[in-house]
């Protein structure tokens, strides 16, 4: 087995391998950090490489913390029955991974989100690492594998659901029978696709 295969096997079931103990120690530190942090290198090198990361200029790795569970909506100021306030029991129509990608994109507006992957969770939070690319960097522009991200129609791709997590949330992994209301978009089909 090559190095990447060993890493992948260890991360398949983190609690049973050495990764579990490492994660415990790391999360103690991660909880004290801000929600969005730029890091030097990926925690899961095998996953990052599989999703398009390269150790060269123009690539940035960002670790994002997202609160788990449903979305608590803001409290109303006007008077109403507490049961009709509509604060709890509403879940967002986006995955936490997609939300994490958007958080990273807002923190670094000059970069584009390429992809992301899970790195850990506890009872309150989930952590994802987001691979970001600088579309204006000459190294990126001259690399034919990633130069497409510099084109203007890929600007703000994460906010339009064009990343892998976004496409999954929009139901675009399905096609054929049962997926008639998914394309061109859920909104075009008056929300019947979800």
From Swiss-Prot:
InterPro entries linked: Rbsml_eL15_core_dom_sf (IPR024794), Ribosomal_eL15 (IPR000439), Ribosomal_eL15_arc (IPR020926), Ribosomal_eL15_CS (IPR020925), Ribosomal_uL23/eL15/eS24_sf (IPR012678)
Pfam family for this entry, one: Ribosomal_L15e
Matches recorded under Gene3D superfamilies: Ribosomal protein l15e
SMART domains reported for this sequence: Ribosomal_L15e
Chain intervals for the UniProt region annotation (Disordered): 164-194
Entry keyword set: Ribonucleoprotein, Ribosomal protein
Amino acid composition bias (Basic residues), ranges on this chain: 167-176
GO BP term (any one): cytoplasmic translation
Domain of life: Archaea
GO (cellular component) term, any one: cytosolic large ribosomal subunit
UniProt GO MF annotations: RNA binding; structural constituent of ribosome
Comp. bias (Basic and acidic residues): 177-194
Family of the protein in this entry: Belongs to the eukaryotic ribosomal protein eL15 family.
Protein's name according to its UniProt entry: Large ribosomal subunit protein eL15
The species this protein was found in: Pyrococcus abyssi (strain GE5 / Orsay)
Phylogenetic classification of the source organism: Archaea, Methanobacteriati, Methanobacteriota, Thermococci, Thermococcales
